[in-house]
Design a protein with these regions (language model features):
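Bacterial N-terminal signal peptides that target proteins for export
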Residues: 2-11
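Exported/periplasmic ABC-transporter solute-binding proteins
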Residues: 27-298
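Hydrophobic helical h-region of N-terminal Sec-dependent signal peptides
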Residues: 11-19
């Protein structure tokens, strides 16, 4: 009797365990799977790491003030970057870039074939266009000049303003020095106009920068010179060329005939920081700075 009771208890226990196992299994099969908690997507724009390091630029005195304005804006956004902008002229800029003495050279003209032959890895980055105005002392009022007349004046063939509709006064020519990008562009666009290759008169008063040219013309009677649009102000008189006023808008619409590219030059692909600076120059913000005095390329 005792053995039978013990058997009943064992069977009852086994039945209870079986029912529990079945219940747990069903719960596991029918339970809704739970997903790991997810974070709300960020609405903030990813931020780029600020740049750091130093850049050196040298060359064209036309590009120099523009490059300085661009450098100031870039350094304001990247306080760990230092950019040194020097002058020296376009030829110096090209040579310095080719010899790797600067990160970026500056040239206010096209690069010469001879320069590409000497430095075959040069890469040219055009950042703007610039007009070249023909300016006179404030007392000299000219209704306009043709390119042919400008060519003859700077060649020393026309020597009196009365020959081009001005007052009876001897002309004193002011020019940039050899190696200047502004001079190189002027020689290409004006002195070689029409298939002729005339030389600038040896009597010209040579100056080493656009700023110096402007000062001499503003302060010296009966002078005439060529000057970057970026240096035009009320101190000198720009003459219309071929009937077109010397204005940025007229370069942009291709009616003003004397203009040239403003270039930055690297020896091969630019380094990382130089590329970042060039990218900034070509951005909407950089080109807005260009547009203050020059013609943007974007």
């Amino acid at each position: 009797m005792k053995q039978r009771r013990t058997l009943y208890l064992v069977l009852a226990g086994l039945l209870t365990l079986s029912l529990l196992a079945t219940t747990v299994g069903c719960q596991q099969e029918t339970a809704e799977p739970t997903e790991p908690p997810t974070e709300e997507p960020s609405t903030e724009e990813p931020t780029e790491e600020p740049e750091e390091g130093n850049l050196s630029l040298a060359g064209s005195t036309t590009v120099q003030p523009l490059a300085q304005s661009l450098a100031d804006a870039y350094m304001a956004q990247n306080p760990d970057v230092g950019i040194d902008v020097g002058g020296g002229g376009s030829s110096t800029g090209v040579t310095s870039a080719g010899e790797d003495t600067v990160d970026i050279g500056m040239a206010s003209r096209n690069i010469k074939d001879s320069e590409f032959e000497e430095f075959p890895d040069l890469q040219v980055h055009t950042i703007a266009f610039d007009g070249i105005a023909i300016v006179t002392h404030p007392d000299i009022q000219l209704e306009g000049l043709t390119i042919e007349q400008v060519q003859s004046i700077f060649a020393g063939e026309i020597t009196n303003f009365s020959e081009v509709g001005g007052p009876d006064a001897e002309i004193f020519v002011v020019s940039r020095e050899e190696g200047s990008g502004t001079r190189g562009a002027f020689e290409e666009l004006v002195m070689e106009h029409g298939g002729e290759e005339k030389l600038i008169t040896a009597d010209a008063n040579l100056q080493s920068s656009n700023g110096a040219v402007r000062t001499v013309v503003a302060e010296t009677e009966n002078t005439i010179a060529y000057l970057s649009f970026g240096f035009l102000d009320g101190s000198v008189n720009p003459a219309p060329i071929n009937g077109v006023e010397a204005e940025v808008a007229n370069v942009a619409n291709d009616t003003y005939p004397i203009y040239r590219p403003l270039n930055m030059v690297t020896n091969g692909p630019p380094n990382e920081l130089a590329q970042a600076f060039l990218d900034f120059i070509m951005s909407a913000e950089g080109q807005a700075i260009v547009a203050e005095d020059y013609i943007p390329v974007q």
